[in-house]
Amino acid sequence: MKFIDEARIEVIAGDGGDGSASMRREKFVPFGGPDGGDGGRGGNVYAIADRNINTLIDYRYAKKHMARNGENGRGSDCYGKGGDDITLRMPVGTVVTDMDTGELIADLTEHDQQVMLAKGGSGGLGNLHFKSSTNRAPRQKTDGKPGERRMLRLELKVLADVGLLGMPNAGKSTFISSVSNAKPKIADYPFTTLAPNLGVVRVGPSKSFVIADIPGLIEGAAEGAGLGHQFLRHLQRTGVLLHLVDLAPFDESVDPVAEAKAIVGELRKYDEALYEKPRWLVLNKLDMVPEDERDARVADFLERFGWDGPVFQISALTGQGCEALCYAIYDYLAEHSDAHRAAEEEDLAADVRFRDAPPSDGGATSGGDA
């Protein structure tokens, strides 16, 4: 299935039904009084996170989603039926934003998390409500309220603990396939990876973390070169970034230091917060460097790159150094996960508007069709 991580949709909640202006008509009851019922409420539109969905492709083509209107009230004190709700199933990690106001409506981070996107209109009042001691036969009634109508932007950000950065052919796909259960396409040409890949790395019976591989970046990605830099959004939820560098490029004219600096520059252009995220340097393809030259080549790279953070030397192809790197990642995540989660929850509490859950009897369900 094609990977789609962005879509724009319109959601329209149902209108409330109109109240009824009716009088009781019954044999031997000459002055029956008002008996007009209220209109039914309009249906709501909900989003629910589903871990079995991993793309927004349904919403790329089905752009309008409408809940049903409430029915009008009738005589004999009959209330109109409420409109059926609809539920839109979306991947875990979807962010929903109102395109007109910029309001963050929902951040779906957990399976089965449910959020109201548009509220149905309330039903109108029947003339039964307007009866008084001075007005025994009221003709007044009210119309139902219109439901909310919104243009929404859906943006999928994959949920991972670790993100991989690097130029095309830096060995990111080889690394993730070496340390996890992911099976990405691997080939000796650039841009083999066209969509994010997720893999689970296990360092013990109950110890694991999720790693995300995104398509490679090149210099000028911010201006649309290569595949652009839009896939960087999938690294925004990670706890640490691994910057993979090809220390032994096939083309001897390619300077690994210049390529590494270009990646950092593109990262900063895209998002300052992502640039400030903890980042580790991973020097890959050591198996391609003669053993007696490794120390000198690594030292030269670090000096010219000006790096003073964590450094790991690996060969993703042979597995050399990968186990130590994975254990270091797990220890770091275990130490920092509580603080990272608390900060994320604090941000969401300030921005995300959660609404009431739908009634227990529920309504219609949609997987992307209106």
From Swiss-Prot:
Residues 127-146, 350-370 are annotated as: Disordered. The keyword GTP-binding applies. Its EC number is 3.6.5.-. One of its GO terms (biological process) is ribosome biogenesis. It is an enzyme of class 3 (hydrolase). GTP binds at residues 166-173, 191-195, 213-216, 284-287, 315-317. GO terms for cellular component: cytoplasm. It is found in: Cytoplasm. Residues 160-334 form the OBG-type G domain. Mg(2+) binds at residues 173, 193. It comes from the Bacteria. Keywords: Cytoplasm, GTP-binding, Hydrolase, Magnesium, Metal-binding, Nucleotide-binding. Monomer. An essential GTPase which binds GTP, GDP and possibly (p)ppGpp with moderate affinity, with high nucleotide exchange rates and a fairly low GTP hydrolysis rate. Plays a role in control of the cell cycle, stress response, ribosome biogenesis and in those bacteria that undergo differentiation, in morphogenesis control. Belongs to the TRAFAC class OBG-HflX-like GTPase superfamily. OBG GTPase family. This is GTPase Obg. It comes from Burkholderia vietnamiensis (strain G4 / LMG 22486).
